[in-house]
Amino acid sequence: MSSFRSMLGVPPSTASTQDSVLVIIDAQGEYAEGKLKISNIEASRPNISSLLEKYRAANAPIVHVVHETPAGAPLFTQGTKLAEIFDELTPKEGEAVVTKHHPGSFADTNLQEILEKSGKKKIVLVGYMAHVCVSTTARQGAQRGWDVIVAEDAVGDRDIPGVDAAQLVKVALAEIADVFGTLVSSKDIN
C-alpha cells in the first residue's frame, strides 16, 4: 500500500541539526502529572531531551511551544507546575518560546516568523499530544510550505474514550506520514 505522498512522487525527508528547526510542542507538566497524563511519557520525554541536547550542541535553532489556558482553568493551570515546561527542557537564552492558545502552533502566534528567520526549510516536531497539537501543527506547517518531519519516538498521547494511547499515536502519525510529513526516529537526526 502506498502513501498519498509516495503516489505524488514526494520522497521521504531526512533531518539533521544543520538543516532543520526543532519545535518542541507542549512539553509541560500537565502531560507528566496532570489530568492529561501521557501514557508513554517515560519513553518519549527522554527522547525529546536527547534531541534538544543534539540541537543545542550544534547551536541549531530551537522553538519551545507552550500551551496557555485562561486563569483558573483545570488544565495547564497558570502559576502551577502543570503549566511549566519540563525542568530538563527549560529554554536557554536564544531559544524561542511561542505561547499558543489553540491546538495548532501556528494559529495566532509568531511561529511562522521565527521559522522564516531561521533560514531553514525543515521543521522537526516533537511533543504532545499526537492526535491534537502535534497533528494540527504538522498539518499547518505543511500548508505553509514547511518540510515537516516528526520524531515518532518523541511524541505521545493519552487514552481517550474508545481508543488507547498507543493506537491513537499510531493513527495520528500514520495520517501525518500519508500526506503531511515524514516520520523518523530521534536517533536518526544528527
UniProtKB/Swiss-Prot annotation:
GO terms for cellular component: extracellular region; host cell cytoplasm; host cell nucleus. GO terms for molecular function: isochorismatase activity. The active site is at D26, K100, C133. Its EC number is 3.3.2.1. Disruption phenotype: Leads to a significant reduction in virulence and increased the concentrations of both free salicylate and its glucoside (SAG) by 100-150% in inoculated cotton plants. One of its GO terms (biological process) is effector-mediated suppression of host innate immune response. Its main location: secreted. The keyword Mitochondrion does not apply. Induction: Expression is up-regulated during the infection stages. It is found in: Secreted; Host cytoplasm; Host nucleus. Changing K100A: Impairs the isochorismatase activity and reduces the virulence. Keywords: Host cytoplasm, Host nucleus, Hydrolase, Secreted, Virulence. PANTHER family: BLR5631 PROTEIN, PEROXYUREIDOACRYLATE/UREIDOACRYLATE AMIDOHYDROLASE-RELATED. This is Secreted isochorismatase effector Isc1. It comes from Verticillium dahliae (strain VdLs.17 / ATCC MYA-4575 / FGSC 10137) (Verticillium wilt).
